[in-house]
Structure formats: C-alpha cells, structure tokens
Amino acid sequence: MTQPYQRILFATDQSENNVTALERTAEYANKNNIQLDILYVLDPAIAGFGNTQIELSSESLYHLEEKSIGQLEIIKRRLIISGSSIYQVHVHLRIGDPRIIVAQEFPTEYQNDLIVLSSSRKNHLQRFFTGSVSSYVIKNAQADVVIMH
C-alpha cells in the first residue's frame, strides 16, 4: 500500500472469519494514524430468512439492532484494549442492502478511501440468492478494496 490512506472502512458480517482480518486492519490503522470505521449492515432480506416478501416486525428489527450494536461495541472495546485510540475507531450500523451501502453510500458519506472486507461466510445457495457483497463492492466502489482471508 503506497497511498497514504486517511479513512478505512472495515465491513463486517460479525462472523469469526472477520477477527483476524479486523485485527490486522486495526493494527495497520493504528500504526499509520488512520481513522477506522467498522460497519455492520443488517440486511432485512437475510434477517427475514431470505424471503424479501416477509417483513420483520418493528419489535424484531429493534432487537436485531440492539444485539448488533452490542456486538459492535464489544469489537470496539477489544480494539481499544489492544492499543487503538478511542478517537480512531468508530462503529456503525446500517439497515439495507450491504452491497449498496458498503460500495457506495457509506464510503461517500464518511469519505473512506480504502474498503477492507474479509472472505465471505455465505454458502453457495445464499450467494446465489443474495449475490456476493465482495464482488459487487470490487466492481462498484470508488475507493480501493482489499479482501482479506
């Protein structure tokens, strides 16, 4: 990475696959004094078991939001304990299509110049119905994109 990045977006699916990739990204951000946005996108289509015709009740959505925010705060605390600055790490939750939010909406709003994704936990059937977030982001993002395993 030769370009001095200013703000990194790490998009998480809150799976165990993300842990190493997030730790490495946070270490890079910390060493280079770069802002780190950690984003989780709650996809109602997936939360509704893949059927976009079934809408989640507002109570169910509220509970999913609260659980997700709690998990993001745990991630933030772990990074701060391991050396990141409280002013450097920011956690965010959005609801919608992860492909659009990660590739376009969020980086535009927060001016992220690097997007980091980790390898997907979706199986082939899920990827068939919902599409690959990574593939979409690579094709449509204006920022540089890194996929970590």
Predicted segments with their positions:
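Structural beta-alpha unit
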Residues: 1-3, 80-115
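Intrinsically disordered or low-complexity boundary/linker segments at protein termini
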Residues: 1-20, 82, 113, 139-149
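Small/aliphatic-rich secondary-structure junction motif
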Residues: 2-55, 109
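General small-molecule cofactor/ligand-binding pocket signal
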Residues: 39, 90-94, 146
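Inter-domain helical "communication" segments and dimerization helices
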Residues: 49-59, 74-85
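A short acidic, glycine-rich active-site loop
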Residues: 56-70
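Short beta->alpha linker loops
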Residues: 93-97, 120, 149
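Glycine-rich, Arg-bearing micro-motifs that act as flexible, cationic patches
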Residues: 114-139
